[in-house]
């Protein structure tokens, strides 16, 4: 069954199941889904991203921990939450990442909130910001010039994930509270571009 939701259909397609291993009831989406609970699912247990990049959320309404979902198969919840610091076995809402463009992505990171202090320009993946010369383990604010990025709490793309997009907040993320409802710290130690 293909469901059309509020955003216009693009080149995104995701199929979700209510049981692990691509078993049980399934639904196919080409646009955002604010709550699988409304479909009778308790949570998504497995999924396949057929096209586009998506971000999944722990709770309905695009709240809670964020999980980047790129093209591929995810037979169980640990396949998409394996590198997070506090894996949650719930995924109840998801949406496409419209501006993901791996080839043309640019991000400015700032030492302090509100775009103050030392800054760094990024256009590549960095498994360790400290290895590239960034002092400390915190980033105060971000400006996304183009593309979409996932920032991780720890080196090696581990820990909480924060999805930053050029078409959200006009690309401006002045404070960690704008990174997502689960963000509680400025700690960011690795950054990568989201693949379309």
From Swiss-Prot:
InterPro entries the record matches: Beta/Gamma-Crystallin, Beta/gamma_crystallin, G_crystallin-like
List every stretch annotated N-terminal arm.
2-11
Q: Which SUPFAM superfamilies match?
A: gamma-Crystallin-like
SUBUNIT field: Homo/heterodimer, or complexes of higher-order. The structure of beta-crystallin oligomers seems to be stabilized through interactions between the N-terminal arms.
Region Connecting peptide: which residues? 99-104
Question: Which keywords belong to this entry?
Answer: Acetylation, Eye lens protein, Repeat
From the broadest rank down, the organism's phylogenetic lineage runs: Eukaryota, Metazoa, Chordata, Craniata, Vertebrata
| GO BP annotations listed | lens development in camera-type eye; visual perception
Q: Does the keyword Acetylation apply?
A: yes
PROSITE patterns recorded: CRYSTALLIN_BETA_GAMMA (PS50915)
What name appears for this protein in its UniProt entry?
Answer: Beta-crystallin A4
């Amino acid at each position: 069954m293909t469901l059309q939701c509020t955003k216009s259909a693009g080149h995104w397609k995701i199929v979700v199941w209510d049981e692990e291993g691509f078993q049980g009831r399934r639904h196919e989406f080409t646009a955002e889904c604010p709550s699988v609970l409304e479909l009778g699912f308790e949570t998504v247990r497995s999924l396949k991203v057929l096209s586009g990049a998506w971000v999944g959320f722990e709770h309905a309404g695009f709240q809670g921990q964020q999980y980047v979902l790129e093209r591929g198969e995810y037979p169980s919840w640990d396949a998409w939450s394996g590198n997070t610091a506090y894996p949650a076995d719930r995924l109840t809402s998801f949406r496409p990442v419209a501006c993901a463009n791996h080839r043309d992505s640019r991000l400015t990171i700032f030492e302090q909130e509100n775009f103050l202090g030392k800054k760094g320009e990024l256009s590549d993946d960095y498994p360790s910001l400290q290895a590239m010369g960034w002092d400390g383990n915190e980033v105060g604010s971000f400006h996304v010039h183009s593309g979409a990025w996932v920032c991780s709490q720890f080196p090696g793309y581990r820990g909480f994930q924060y999805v930053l997009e050029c078409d959200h907040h006009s690309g401006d993320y002045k404070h960690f509270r704008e990174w997502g409802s689960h963000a509680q710290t400025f700690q960011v130690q690795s950054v990568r571009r989201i693949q379309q």
